[in-house]
Design a protein with these regions (language model features):
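Hydrophobic alpha-helical scaffolding
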Residues: 17, 51-55, 84-87, 109-116, ...
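Cap/lid and interdomain-hinge subdomains that line or gate substrate/regulatory clefts
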Residues: 1-98, 102-105
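A near-ubiquitous, low-amplitude feature marking generic local secondary-structure context
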Residues: 28-31, 48, 109, 121, ...
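Active-site loops and adjacent core secondary-structure elements that bind or stabilize anionic groups
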Residues: 97-127
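Anaerobic metallocofactor- and corrinoid-dependent redox/one-carbon enzyme cores
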Residues: 64, 68-72, 118-215
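Conserved active-site and cofactor/substrate-binding residues in soluble primary-metabolism enzymes
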Residues: 18, 22-25, 40, 56-60, ...
Length: 215
């Protein structure tokens, strides 16, 4: 019937009762795949700014993505982000988030709530935005003047996205939506999904310098 209806399907052959490890492994794989599909269907992906200039493989067909994965794309400008931050006035929430930041990061020279206050405000703003827009994935790239509010925002992106990744929201740099989706898939099927880049490799000393890119 599935064949005649044109529905894609798979058949698992084996014995469930008695603990057939092969059957159990196949069932678990299909369950993980279903979890990924459900996560894509039940959340949205956001793109802030535009993809990194010159990297044309980063652009995607939003219509095709929705038709295949039921994943809806929401486009945002950076002005939206600092506008949200301007509306954050709950000092108790900011203070609690500042303490969470201090508990999460090792800050060179020592950190205080006062030192990370602005950072905490932006993290609270980003968390509110993720909740309001029902986001599971974010791809961003800032290519503007790092002055005024824009400069403050630019300096807050890595810690803000790091905190979101910690909470399970996939955040990719360079506006790479495909990497954001890959991070989300890894988070769903294996418990964590991180983004890193190899900046330099010393073959003589067998050293590889890896940047965390927000994770």
């Amino acid at each position: 019937d599935l064949e005649r209806a044109g529905k894609r399907h798979a058949v698992i052959t084996g014995v469930v009762e008695g603990g057939d490890p092969g059957v159990q492994a196949e069932i678990e794989d299909w369950c993980k795949a279903a979890q990924v599909r459900r996560r894509f269907r039940d959340t949205n992906i956001a793109q802030i700014g535009r993809p990194y200039p010159g990297m044309m493989d980063l652009y995607i067909d939003e219509t095709n993505l929705y038709n295949r994965m039921f994943l809806y794309t929401k486009q945002f400008d950076w002005e939206k982000m600092w506008a949200i931050a301007d509306d954050i006035t709950d000092e108790d929430a900011i203070r609690a988030k500042a303490q969470e930041i201090l508990d999460t990061f090792d800050i060179e020279g020592g950190g205080t709530i006062e030192k990370v206050w602005d950072m905490a405000k932006y993290v609270v703003a980003f968390e509110k935005w993720v909740k309001d827009e029902h986001l599971g994935m974010i791809a961003s790239h800032y290519n503007g003047f790092a002055q005024g509010k824009a400069g403050v925002l630019d300096s807050m992106l890595i810690p803000a996205f790091s905190m979101l990744i910690k909470q399970g929201t996939a955040c990719a740099v360079e506006g790479d939506m495909k990497v954001a989706m890959a991070m989300s898939i890894l988070k769903t099927i294996s418990g964590t999904g991180q983004l890193s880049e190899m900046y330099s490799i010393d073959f003589n000393d067998d050293i590889c310098i890896i940047g965390h890119s927000g994770s």
